């Protein structure tokens, strides 16, 4: 998948990410812009999770929504 496809996917799914993690701000979602590591980092930051817990949440979200980076 190229960068444009990933960016398009993210635009489609960022509302679902906001529903899942309501503490993420619009600025957070802009910074994340389809980058998995950024999503994990922002979840850690906003929710005080360890990296492993944030990774697990993101993995569950990816599986549930069939999201591909």
Curated annotation (Swiss-Prot):
Q: Which domain of life is it from?
A: Bacteria
List the Pfam families.
CsbD (PF05532)
Membrane-crossing ranges are: none
Q: Which NCBIfam families match?
A: PRK10428.1
Q: Which family does it belong to?
A: Belongs to the UPF0337 (CsbD) family.
This chain belongs to the protein called: UPF0337 protein ECA0631
The organism of origin for this protein: Pectobacterium atrosepticum (strain SCRI 1043 / ATCC BAA-672)
């Amino acid at each position: 998948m190229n960068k444009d496809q990933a960016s398009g996917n993210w635009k489609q799914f960022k509302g679902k990410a906001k529903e899942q993690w309501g503490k993420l701000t619009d600025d957070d979602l802009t910074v994340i812009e389809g980058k998995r590591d950024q999503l994990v980092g922002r979840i850690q930051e906003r929710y005080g999770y360890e990296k492993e817990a944030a990774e697990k949440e993101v993995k569950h979200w990816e599986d549930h929504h069939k999201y591909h980076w």
